[in-house]
Amino acid sequence: MKVIFLADVKGKGKKGEVKEVPTGYAQNFLIKKNLAKEATAQAIGELRGKQKSEEKAHAELVAEAQAIQAKLAEEATLVEFTEKVGPDGRTFGSITSKKIAEELEKQFGIKLDKRNIKVDSPIRSVGLIDVPVKIYQDITGVINLRVKEG
């Protein structure tokens, strides 16, 4: 019996796959537990339509991420912070990934999740700093920061 897997089943198939499985296994286990459904012509057509819409959405997200990557790569995209500095040259407050995300949106209108900004430890020094950021899956970029004395 041909079935369309609705979820990953270890050793049998992944979500969205159409596979031939024993009839008893399909009816008594996979279909009863909503892990698969029978692969009728209509169900296969729905699956293909769903896969096309997912591919289109993925392509749009990739294009959007590449646009953000290009904007971050421009020389003009320099996120500036003005912080109070102590006598030892370190800032009183620290610059975290949350602050960077907020300033990036405020100064350039670029929305990034703070969890994707890779700051090893909060920034407490003055000067130019490059911060790596994961924009979408394999697409990464670098945020240029300038921390000034204020």
Swiss-Prot record:
GO molecular function (one): structural constituent of ribosome
Keyword Glycoprotein listed: no
Signal peptide feature range: none
Keywords: Ribonucleoprotein, Ribosomal protein, RNA-binding, rRNA-binding
GO cellular component terms, A-Z: ribonucleoprotein complex; ribosome
Pfam families associated with the record: Ribosomal_L9_C (PF03948), Ribosomal_L9_N (PF01281)
Function summary: Binds to the 23S rRNA.
Name the UniProt record assigns to this protein: Large ribosomal subunit protein bL9
Keyword Transferase carried by entry: no
Membrane-spanning segments: none
Superkingdom: Bacteria
Biological-process GO terms, alphabetical: translation
Similarity-based family: Belongs to the bacterial ribosomal protein bL9 family.
HAMAP family the UniProt entry points to: Ribosomal_bL9 (MF_00503)
